[in-house]
Amino acid sequence: MQKTNLSRLRSHLMLMIPIGLLACGLGSPVPGDETVVLTPSPLVAGPATETGEPQFPATAAATTAVTCTHYVAPNGDDKDPGTTTTQPWATFQHAADTAQPGDTVCFRGGTYAFTEEAYLTQSGTAGATITFIAYPGETPVLDGGGSVGELLILDQYTSYVRISGFALRNFTIWGMELSGENRYVQLDHLDVAGGEASIHFTVGETEAPPDYGPVEHITLEDSTIHGSEYSAVDCTPGPCNHMVIRRVEIYDTGIVGESFYGSDGLEFARGYPVLVEDCYVHDNGGDGIDLNSRDRQGNATGVVVRRNRVVRNHLNGIKLWAGGRMENNIVWGQGNSAVWVGTFTSTLEIINNTIAYNMWDTTYSERNWAVVAGYPEEILPYPPVTLTLVNNIFAFNADPTDGGSTGMYLGGGVQLTEHHNLYYSRADGEITAEFVSGRDPDFTRAEIADGTWTNFTGQGQNDLTDAPLFVSGWPGVNLHLQESSPAVDNGSIADAPADDAEGRVRDAQPDIGAYEWWEPVAWIYVPLTIRSS
């Protein structure tokens, strides 16, 4: 029999794709294959499935055109003019010392060995940012050799700067520091790994004012942050005001060395407004997202956490100490309470989130309420919390075979607006409401269904108590809804965001939870060519 050369075998297929998928894009081809695919913008994380890893363009330069005014290369020379690719500079420090407002310094790929910290002291202006960016298609690696404490330090007052497209490695303390009084700084397309913290904003003791002032108007986006010993992206002592964290993957912090209570994925002790959106925060030793833990006066305004996937963090998932809005988040696999809010005086909105299958992994979990709002602390025995809960799914929280499932705790200071939620965690205690008088504070699933909860609280209109019918449960968790889910088309129209956790537009009758169920409106056929290796 004649043998077929598989390395030359090509199959020409027609790939049938539901047109609804085109809004999300398809994954990248496997190395070694020649595949014609539709790909998302490099600034969009995917895929949508819970167990798959999202594709972030960690060190790829921004997709906008880059006009380089200067060049740096590992084999360059700081004595050269740096204005051509054939006569580049050699070091980040020289580039930082020399660049002027409006300059774009392009770094060629390769490893830049640091023997000491690089200090950025020059500022751009409102119309002329100083940009340090990877040369298109290449990845410059800033390497501390395991001995340099910090790699990049934006000195006090350094502002109007962009840093884009770098990998930071082998530092011992912080990969990047913004010391204080830094404003209008853009950090994007970074891959930062290791140290005590990957990126640190402000300097000083935890409970004290910052040594060099706050930082403000900072954007961190389209980056991967991982493997630090303590909190990966850390604003302590703060404040960090007017912050945007967007399309960032944060993982594996606090897993080695001393961990847990100082090892959150994203931790901002003080400051607002803060926007955290479209991030994937997973597998960290402490909390996933922890905001405003030192804003003890409460009433933090402009705090928005939306369209994030917060997965398998060993303590809490999302923690809003002093107020904010949670919208369209997927929260599963935490080791402790999935959501903890309202430690201080707060106004909180929790809208269209899916919070399920938390406290199931016995290797790091401990049993607690799945959602906690207004828990009594020494500072405020019952903090006053104005809380809105609408269109959320709370289901299957805490392993029923290991201590039993758990529900929601609402403290005595909670002023509640609650309707159009689905509860399916603990049949004999879905809600513990300490603010209720005249009866036991624990409400069963049946009491939500039969109107007892509504009679005592005036809340609970259109709540559901049926199994939500996710695509799959533990351990292969996928919290998308099946077509027959009771959550489909049963959300509050007035309160639902315009889109869902994946940016898909919600229809005229929105679903409960973070994911809007959808079906293809048409099918198209795309040619697919595969070469076997």
Residue ranges and their predicted role:
Residues M1-C68, D80, T91-H94, T98-P101, ...:
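Intrinsically disordered, low-complexity Ser/Thr/Pro-rich tracts
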Residues F114-T115, P140, N170-T172, V185, ...:
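Surface-exposed loop/turn segments connecting beta-strands in extracellular beta-rich domains
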Residues G52-F56, A60, T98, D442-G458, ...:
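Surface beta-loop-beta hairpin patches that serve as ligand-binding interfaces in beta-rich domains
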